[in-house]
Curated annotation (Swiss-Prot):
Belongs to the AB hydrolase superfamily. Lipase family. The gene is lip2. It catalyses: a triacylglycerol + H2O = a diacylglycerol + a fatty acid + H(+). GO terms for molecular function: metal ion binding; triacylglycerol lipase activity. This is Lipase 2. Keywords: Calcium, Hydrolase, Lipid degradation, Lipid metabolism, Metal-binding, Secreted, Signal, Zymogen.
Length: 691
């Protein structure tokens, strides 16, 4: 009987040892399969990895449960057979099984520790790509879930086949997993990166992924066993931007906009505006795109074919004729128009004409500023109004100015009227001067003889009172204001002053040997105090109407106007100046805004909108800012610029922080663009005629 019991105990021990061996072999096969899977395919997105991090814990717990049950069974057998001499063999086998199980467990932990460390490093570099791969992530999540189910089924089938596995097979050591270089394709809502160092294999890999959306990936991430501390480490690495973060290569598009009040930001905006593509095409801007580049040392030819001459308005002083504290007329300190355009390679000039003189005198001075020579106001004109016939001498910016050699003329405020009158004299002459010359003989200026067509390519006016301004009628041309203006000219005409306000032809300049008292007495007898030959009168409604009747449209010239408005309608229907309008124009804005005619009320502080659009007796057409303004023989009226007062066009309001230098840069480069299109249109027409 004792022998039968020992045989049964031996059979039980043998059976238990077999069960333990089978379980150990099963664990070895599973761990080997997991190690191989982790070597083949690292994780590709955050969502799939999160699911992977959760599932290995469940499988690890299942393995640990099997180990605990096996150990418990073996302990029970030890207690039951502790006194038997044959237990030694069972203990040896048990220790071998435990050692192998422990070794397999260490292998699993080693593999997963390495995997967690590598995944943590990889997560940071792939964070921005993961954010851009939402669609791919959802598809891959489905694939991961299907694969996990397949793996569980495979593990169960492996258990039934584990009896054929060699028990002496050594466990495979953990191997280093190479970093994953797969990149997720950016979605349509993410701007493309300008980084030239991005991997070139991205498109090929994305194409492979998108080619078979329903095909399961056989290289799924390995199961991992991590604790809470390791999981926190992974999440922290996901939140920190890494070197490969795309957001660092998009020039701050994801960052809030920086204020542009600082000079550095404003200068950068101006630089960007100046470096925008310039076009010379009439209909297809893209075909004739042209980038603005500064003139090189050996570059003589400017970007524009015809010189651009900017003509200032009433009270304007430019260049050496401007006092020390007088602001830069063209652009102020916001954007120095002449200087910046010259840096970009354009041939531009700022004319210096009378600040207080009439449009007639200013037009004559403008001609000699371009052509060069001593100013000749005309014998008939000098005799009629009672001032000197000759004025100062100009060097000239274009001594060979003649028909066929053209200029572009851009005038601000009264400057727009001045250039219109000069072009009229060039083309049709001055009838009074021609008649006086026939009657009295002598010399006559070429400006007054007429017949000088094709010398002006375009005329552009900025906030010009083509039809006059009520501010001049009710304020500027009043006797009190005129006396103040002429008194200022009288004072600045002293022998120690180098500032010329433009009334020297009226005697407003102290002679070298003349005392100041004698100078005052002489000037007080000048006819200017009662004359209409001055700016104050020419800016009135009546003075502007006379100019409109004197001038005509040239069918060969491109005409363009720009207009601003800086007033709003009050509760009583009148126009009041907007907040931010230049403070010196508050009174004039209210004078215009309370005009009896409603259509004359809206204004830019000095000029009514209706007056700036175009001369009332000449044809016009409304154009957009995008279409090429190249029509000739008709006024092309640009859209009204909301919020721009009279001096915003030239940027001299240093108290207006809303108007930036970049805004002026865009405005004037837009004008230059139109002038280049005019030249391109003319060249195209010449080629067609030649063919």
């Amino acid at each position: 009987m004792l022998r039968g019991q020992e045989e049964r105990k031996y059979s039980i021990r043998k059976y238990s040892i077999g069960v333990v061996s089978v379980l150990a072999a099963t664990m070895f096969v599973v761990s080997s399969h997991e190690a191989q899977a982790s070597e083949k395919t690292p994780t590709s997105n955050a969502a799939a990895q999160k699911e992977t991090l959760n599932q290995p814990g469940e499988q690890g717990n299942a393995i640990t449960s099997h180990q605990m049950q096996s150990g418990k069974q073996l302990d029970d057998m030890h207690k039951e057979n502790g006194k038997s001499g044959t237990v030694t063999e069972g203990k040896d086998t048990l220790q071998s099984s435990k050692h192998q199980s422990t070794q397999n467990s260490k292998t699993i932990r080693t593999q997963n520790d390495n995997q967690v460390k590598q995944d943590s490093e990889r997560q940071g570099s792939k964070q921005s790509h993961q954010n851009n791969a939402t669609n791919n992530t959802e598809r891959q999540n489905d694939q991961v879930q299907n694969t996990h189910h397949a793996e569980r089924n495979g593990s169960q089938s492996t258990t039934s086949q584990s009896n054929d596995v060699d028990k002496s097979q050594p466990s495979i050591p953990a191997q280093k997993v190479l970093p994953n270089h797969d990149k997720a394709a950016p979605t349509s809502t993410t701007p493309p990166s300008n980084d030239k160092t991005a991997p070139k294999s991205t498109k090929a890999q994305d194409a492979t992924t998108d080619k078979h959306p329903n095909q399961q990936d056989t290289h799924q991430p390995a199961h991992q066993i991590i604790d809470a501390k390791q999981d926190d480490t992974v999440r922290q690495s996901e939140q920190k931007p890494q070197v490969g973060d795309l957001s660092k290569h998009i020039d701050g598009q994801n960052s809030p906009e920086k204020p542009t009040d600082k000079n550095t930001d404003n200068k950068q905006l101006i630089k960007d505006a100046l470096q925008a593509p310039k076009t010379r095409s009439t209909t297809n801007a893209a075909a004739d795109a042209k980038k603005v580049r500064p003139l090189k040392a050996n570059q003589v030819q400017p970007l524009n074919k015809y010189p651009v001459v900017f003509v200032h308005g009433f009270l304007g002083l430019v260049g050496d004729n401007a006092p020390a504290l007088y602001p830069n007329y063209w652009g102020g300190n916001k954007f120095k128009v002449i200087e910046e355009l010259r840096k970009q390679g354009y041939n531009v000039h700022q004319a210096s004409v009378s600040a207080f003189g009439s449009n007639y005198d200013r037009a004559v001075e403008l001609y000699y500023y371009i052509k060069g020579g001593r100013v000749d106001y005309g014998a008939a004109h000098a005799a009629k109004y009672g001032h000197e016939r000759y004025g100062k001498t100009y060097k000239g910016i274009m001594p060979n100015w003649e028909p066929g050699k053209k200029v572009h003329l851009v005038g601000h405020s009264m400057g727009g009227q001045t250039i219109r009158l000069m072009e009229e004299f060039l083309r049709n002459g001055n009838k009074e001067e021609i008649a006086y010359h026939k009657a009295h003989g002598g010399e006559i200026s070429p400006l007054f003889t007429g017949g000088h067509n094709n010398m002006v390519a375009s005329i552009t006016t900025l906030a010009t009172p083509h039809n006059g301004s009520q501010a001049a009628d009710k304020f500027g041309n009043t006797e009190a204001v005129r006396k103040i203006m002429f008194a200022l000219n009288r004072f600045m005409g002293n022998k120690y002053s180098n500032i010329d306000l433009g009334l020297t032809q009226w005697g407003f300049k102290q002679l070298p040997n003349e005392s100041y008292i004698d100078y005052i007495k002489r000037v007080s007898k000048s006819k200017i105090w009662t004359s209409d030959d001055n700016a104050a009168y020419d800016l009135t409604l009546d003075g502007s109407a006379k100019l409109n009747n004197m001038t005509s449209m040239n069918p060969n010239i491109t005409y363009t106007t720009y207009t601003g408005v800086s007033s709003h309608t009050g509760p009583l229907g009148y126009e009041n100046p907007d907040l931010g309008t230049f403070f010196l124009m508050d009174t004039t804005s209210r004078i215009i805004g309370h005009d009896a005619r409603e259509e004359w009320r809206k204004n830019d502080g000095v000029v009514p909108v209706i007056s700036s659009l175009h001369p009332s007796n000449q044809p016009f057409i409304n154009v957009t800012n995008d279409e090429p303004a190249t029509r000739r023989g008709i006024w092309q009226v640009k859209p009204i610029i909301q919020g721009w007062d009279h001096v915003d066009f030239i940027g001299v309001d240093f108290l207006d922080f809303k108007r930036k230098g970049a805004e002026l840069a865009n405005f004037y480069t837009g004008i230059i663009n139109d002038l280049l299109r005019v030249e391109a249109t003319e060249s195209k027409g010449t080629q067609l005629k030649a063919s």
